[in-house]
């Protein structure tokens, strides 16, 4: 008779009555799978087994299961942080009108950054350097900088997205302006996203311009929104004042504001004049624009406020591009360039001494310092006890900065 394989010999051996192992009777009582909340249904099973038979069954069952588990994709546990949840949402469904506002705002400012960069590259003729960066605890951004271009001595546009946790003292401080923040929590997850931009042209006849629009949100433990608010604005800082430029800039911004609320422009223009003010110099940084902060549910619902912010940001290109196109190639003297440097020095003073956004960024753990200081000009100057000549163009600018004007 042909030799049997080892598996056949093992089966015959286990089946043979002459094979004697200590046998054990095994009884089990359990409940069948059921959605019923009633008493357990009993079932009793009796198995006569030998140790060798049990080992064979175990090996045959566990080995394929272990192999299958090794092949399977790892099971993803629920994301533990707000940043993880948002990253998962973007992977699974992208960003659309039903997405959380924080993701919609991030998408919008990234799109606007790309549009503005493309238009400024058209005006200047040179390309921006673009740096993508990430924060260790979630978030990141894109910093676009053009230095020593044809039109812009320095131009920077930065998108920043920050996830973090507010400690108890910060919660109590913020709750003064936002009552929907839960004061009982020891810490609260937060999200902040914004687009910041500063353009410093070479030509002293062309004005510096600044823009910032941002969104802040605190979140419940399940990731839903708790408190939210928008902030932002834009403003013009000329070295030489052309009334027609100031009127065009303010008129364009006013139109965006008026489409939502007729009170917005006068209110936010006044706020801008007061905020961008060098207290130690006794003069405004520039000729203003609009500025607002903490726009939350006490003003308008979130959708309407988001729409307002979108319109303001979209108004930037039509408010500034006609001005830079008109002024970028005007002739100027060395003395006029020196005056521009002195005005830039005042700009630097405000940003480093008074600006809350700069202070917030520099004091946020894990922040990107290069992006925060992107707003500073490539060159600036200071002279001891310098005063412009009476009745000069330089003096007229200082007069307006000391007594802000209504342009529209």
For each of these PLM feature ranges, what is it?
Residues 269, 273-291, 325-371:
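An amphipathic alpha-helical core segment
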Residues 158, 162-191, 237-241, 281, ...:
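Mature, function-bearing regions of proteins
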Residues 143-232:
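Internal mixed beta-strand/loop scaffold within catalytic domains of large alpha/beta enzymes
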Residues 358, 363-408:
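TerminUS-proximal long segments
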Residues 225-331:
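Long, contiguous internal "core" modules enriched in hydrophobic/ aromatic residues
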Residues 67-98:
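Membrane-proximal, acidic/low-complexity disordered segments on the non-cytosolic side
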Residues 1-61, 71:
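N-terminal mitochondrial targeting presequence
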Residues 97-181, 298-333, 337-353:
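Gly/Pro-rich turn-and-neighbor structural signature
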């Amino acid at each position: 008779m042909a030799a049997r394989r080892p598996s056949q010999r093992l089966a015959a051996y286990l089946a043979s009555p002459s094979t004697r192992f200590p046998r054990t009777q095994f009884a089990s009582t359990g409940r069948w799978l059921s959605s019923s909340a009633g008493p357990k249904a009993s079932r009793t099973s009796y198995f006569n087994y030998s140790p060798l038979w049990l080992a064979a069954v175990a090996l045959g069952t566990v080995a394929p299961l272990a192999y299958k588990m090794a092949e399977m994709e790892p099971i993803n546990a629920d994301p533990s942080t707000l940043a993880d949840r948002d990253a998962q949402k973007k992977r699974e469904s992208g960003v659309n009108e039903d997405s959380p506002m924080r993701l919609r705002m991030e998408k919008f400012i990234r799109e606007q950054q790309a549009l503005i960069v493309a238009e400024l590259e058209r005006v200047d003729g040179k390309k921006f350097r673009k740096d993508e960066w990430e924060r260790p605890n979630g978030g990141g951004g894109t910093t676009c900088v053009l230095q020593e271009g044809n039109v812009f001595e320095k131009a920077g546009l930065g998108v920043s997205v920050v996830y973090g946790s507010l400690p108890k003292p910060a919660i109590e401080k913020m709750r003064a302006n936002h009552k929907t923040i839960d004061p009982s929590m020891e810490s609260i997850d937060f999200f902040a996203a914004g687009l910041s931009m500063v353009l410093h042209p070479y030509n002293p006849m062309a004005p510096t311009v600044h823009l910032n629009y941002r969104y802040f949100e605190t979140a419940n433990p399940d990731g839903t929104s708790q408190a939210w608010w928008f902030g932002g604005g834009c403003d013009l800082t000329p070295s030489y004042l052309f009334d027609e430029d100031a009127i065009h800039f303010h008129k364009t911004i006013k139109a965006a504001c008026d489409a939502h609320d007729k009170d917005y422009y006068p209110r936010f223009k006044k706020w801008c004049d007061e905020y961008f003010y060098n207290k130690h110099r006794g003069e405004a940084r520039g000729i203003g624009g609009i500025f607002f902060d903490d726009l939350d549910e006490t003003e308008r619902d979130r959708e309407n406020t988001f729409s307002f912010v979108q319109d303001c940001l979209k108004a930037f290109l039509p408010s500034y591009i006609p001005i830079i196109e008109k002024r970028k190639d005007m002739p100027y003297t060395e003395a006029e360039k020196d005056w521009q440097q002195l005005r830039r020095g005042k700009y630097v003073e405000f940003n480093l001494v008074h600006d809350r956004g700069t202070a917030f960024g520099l004091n946020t753990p894990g922040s990107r310092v290069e992006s925060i200081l992107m707003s500073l000009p490539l060159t600036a100057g200071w002279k001891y006890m310098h005063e412009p000549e009476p009745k000069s163009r330089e003096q007229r600018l200082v007069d307006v900065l000391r007594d802000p004007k209504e342009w529209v």
